[in-house]
Amino acid sequence: DPGEEWFVVAPGGVAQGDLPQNRTSLGGKVLRLDLDTGFPLTDNPFISSQNERERYVYSYGHRNIQGVAVQPGTGAVYTAEHGPSNNDEVNLIRAGGNYGWDPAQKGMVDGYDESVPMTDLELYPDAVPAVWQSGERTQAICGAAFLEGEQWGALDGALVITALKGSKLLVLTLAEDGSVEE
């Protein structure tokens, strides 16, 4: 359909520490553009930026997005993000949201420090917290999709995430506010 929006996910921080927090770089971002024109959508959060690349940015501060799923009925976007050795994350994407990955620690670290938190709420108190984390060990999450249809029974509407470690499928049930139900 003309004017249909789409989400394009850029690679993680491409192993350069300052890129995830630099909104004029496309690394470590969720980008939103019009499929017909290739231009950024006019309601993107940084559309008035003087920098052309920043106009495409929908959210930033991501480490390594491996999967994206759009929730049927709501249009909410979730990402599956692979952590370094811990704390894989599932994030509910918010317009203009900073997801807190900063391996350069606001320039205090030379290079790329993978030991920093996936979502650093101390360095970025306004960062958007993950709706799910793997904890102390990575599960190497990658693909993401929503189960849709009555054939899924009680799982209809669940978010499923594939995990490379242990070759498993994680099934996450979501609350109305988008958080993961325990």
How should each PLM-predicted stretch be described?
Residues G3-E181:
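Beta-propeller domain segments
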